[in-house]
C-alpha cells in the first residue's frame, strides 16, 4: 500500500471518528433536557454577589527561581508546600510568608507534591517516574538536601499527580504517564492496587490528575489525555466504575465537589465541567466567552459549599471564579492589581476555605484571602 493511499485512509478514518463524536454529543444533549444553570435560573436563583474586594491578594510567596508546577495545603491551613522547576520543594508558613523547609530534590523535573494528612511528610513525583516521600523532621545538610524516607517505585512513566488518602498517612495514590494509577502503602513502599494498564476499562493515554473523595475515601477520580475522567473504587481495582465523556482535549485536572457525589474537571479544550458520579451525567459546562482565548484549564478547586469554582488558565495569566449554579464568571483574578505575570499552573483552597493559593510560571505563589466582612462561601 502506497503512502498516498495510507494518508487517504487516515483522512477518511479521522472524518468518521469526528462524525461519530458529533453524533454522541448530539445524543447526550437530547438525553439531558436541561443543565444546572438553566434549572437554577428557572428556580429564580440569583447570581452570587462577589466582587474584586471580596478576594484580595494578601501575600506573595517569593523564593523559587523556576516555574511553580504544584502546591498543596496542610489540613491545619497554615502551611503550603510548593514544587518548582528549580528542583526544590519549599514549605511555607502561609501566615508569615516564611520558608520553613527548602528541600533539594534528587530529580529537578518535579510535577506534583502533596502533604500527608498529619502534615509531617511531603510527597513529590515527576519525570523520574518515582514518588519520593520526605519527612519534615529530618535534618537537611548545608545544601538543603534532606534524605528520602521512602521511594515508591513501580510506574513506567512520569508521575503526574500524587494525593494522600484523607486521614490516612499510610496510603497514597499516584497517577502516571504509563496510563495507570497506583494505591501505595507508604509504610512498606509496596503497591496495594494498580488501576488501569492491562484492564480494558482503564485509560488509553497518560493519566494527568487524581482526586480522592472526602466523603468516601474508597472512591477516586482520574483525568487523562484520552479526554475522559474515570471513577475508581479502591476495593475493586480490576475495572473503572464509570467513564465520563464530554471533553475534546486532555483532562488536566479533576477535583471532587464538597459533597463527594459530584466532581469537576478542567481540560485543554478550555472548559470546566461538572459531573454527577451517581448518574454519570454531565451537569454543567463552564466555558468563557471568546472561544479558546484563555487556553487550557490547568487547575481547579471548589469553595467549601461548592457554590464557587476557581479555575486557572494557561493564557492571560488568569484565574476565573465561577458561580457553579448559574455558570457565570463572577470575578477574574487576572484583572486584579496583584495578579500573576505568567500562566497560573496550580491552585488550591485552605482546609477551612478561607484562603486561595495560586502558583504560577512567574516563580511566585500568591495567597488570596476573602476580604471585608464576607464569610467563606
UniProtKB/Swiss-Prot annotation:
CDD domains: WD40. Keywords: Abscisic acid signaling pathway, Cell membrane, Cytoplasm, Membrane, Nucleus, Plant defense, Repeat, Transducer, WD repeat. Induction: Induced locally by Alternaria brassicicola but systemically by Fusarium oxysporum. InterPro entries: G-protein_beta_WD-40_rep, Gprotein_B, Guanine_nucleotide-bd_bsu, WD40/YVTN_repeat-like_dom_sf, WD40_repeat_CS, WD40_repeat_dom_sf, WD40_rpt. Its main location: membrane. A motif (DWD box 1) lies at residues 220-235, 263-278. The keyword Membrane applies. It is found in: Cell membrane; Cytoplasm; Nucleus. SUPFAM superfamilies: WD40 repeat-like. Guanine nucleotide-binding proteins (G proteins) are involved as a modulator or transducer in various transmembrane signaling systems. The beta and gamma chains are required for the GTPase activity, for replacement of GDP by GTP, and for G protein-effector interaction. The heterotrimeric G-protein controls defense responses to necrotrophic and vascular fungi probably by modulating cell wall-related genes expression (e.g. lower xylose content in cell walls); involved in resistance to fungal pathogens such as Alternaria brassicicola and Fusarium oxysporum. Modulates root architecture (e.g. This is Guanine nucleotide-binding protein subunit beta. The gene is GB1.
Amino acid at each position: 500500500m502506497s503512502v498516498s493511499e495510507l494518508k487517504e485512509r487516515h483522512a477518511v478514518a479521522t472524518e468518521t471518528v469526528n462524525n461519530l463524536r458529533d453524533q454522541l454529543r448530539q445524543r447526550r444533549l437530547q438525553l439531558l433536557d436541561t443543565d444546572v444553570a438553566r434549572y437554577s435560573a428557572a428556580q429564580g436563583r440569583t447570581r452570587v454577589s462577589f466582587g474584586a474586594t471580596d478576594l484580595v491578594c494578601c501575600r506573595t510567596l517569593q523564593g523559587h527561581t523556576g516555574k511553580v508546577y504544584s502546591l498543596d495545603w496542610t489540613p491545619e491551613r497554615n502551611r503550603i508546600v510548593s514544587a518548582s522547576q528549580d528542583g526544590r520543594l519549599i514549605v511555607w508558613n502561609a501566615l508569615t510568608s516564611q520558608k520553613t523547609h527548602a528541600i533539594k530534590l534528587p530529580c529537578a523535573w518535579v510535577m506534583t507534591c502533596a502533604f500527608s494528612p498529619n502534615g509531617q511528610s511531603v510527597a513529590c513525583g515527576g519525570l523520574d517516574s518515582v514518588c519520593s516521600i520526605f519527612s519534615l523532621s529530618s535534618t537537611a545538610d548545608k545544601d538543603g538536601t534532606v534524605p528520602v524516607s521512602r521511594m515508591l517505585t513501580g510506574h513506567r512513566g512520569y508521575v503526574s499527580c500524587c494525593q494522600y488518602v484523607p486521614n490516612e498517612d499510610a496510603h497514597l495514590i499516584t497517577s502516571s504517564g504509563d496510563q495507570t494509577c497506583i494505591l501505595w502503602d507508604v509504610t512498606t513502599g509496596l503497591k496495594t492496587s494498580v488501576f488501569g494498564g492491562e484492564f480494558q476499562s482503564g485509560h488509553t493515554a497518560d493519566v494527568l490528575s487524581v482526586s480522592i473523595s472526602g466523603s468516601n475515601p474508597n472512591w477516586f477520580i482520574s483525568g487523562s489525555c484520552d479526554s475522559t475522567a474515570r471513577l475508581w473504587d479502591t476495593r475493586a481495582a480490576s475495572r473503572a466504575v464509570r467513564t465520563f465523556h464530554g471533553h475534546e482535549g486532555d483532562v488536566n485536572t479533576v477535583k471532587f465537589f464538597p459533597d463527594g457525589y459530584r466532581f469537576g474537571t478542567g481540560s485543554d479544550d478550555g472548559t470546566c465541567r461538572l459531573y454527577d458520579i451517581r448518574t454519570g451525567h454531565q451537569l454543567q459546562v463552564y466555558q468563557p466567552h471568546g472561544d479558546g482565548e484563555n487556553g487550557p484549564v490547568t487547575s481547579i478547586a471548589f469553595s467549601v459549599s461548592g457554590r464557587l469554582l476557581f479555575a486557572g488558565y494557561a493564557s492571560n495569566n488568569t484565574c476565573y471564579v465561577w458561580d457553579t449554579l448559574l455558570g457565570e464568571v463572577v470575578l477574574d483574578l487576572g484583572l486584579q492589581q496583584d495578579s500573576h505575570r505568567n500562566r497560573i499552573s496550580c491552585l488550591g483552597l485552605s482546609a477551612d476555605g478561607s484562603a486561595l493559593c495560586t502558583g504560577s510560571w512567574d516563580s511566585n505563589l500568591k495567597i488570596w484571602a476573602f476580604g471585608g466582612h464576607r464569610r467563606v462561601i
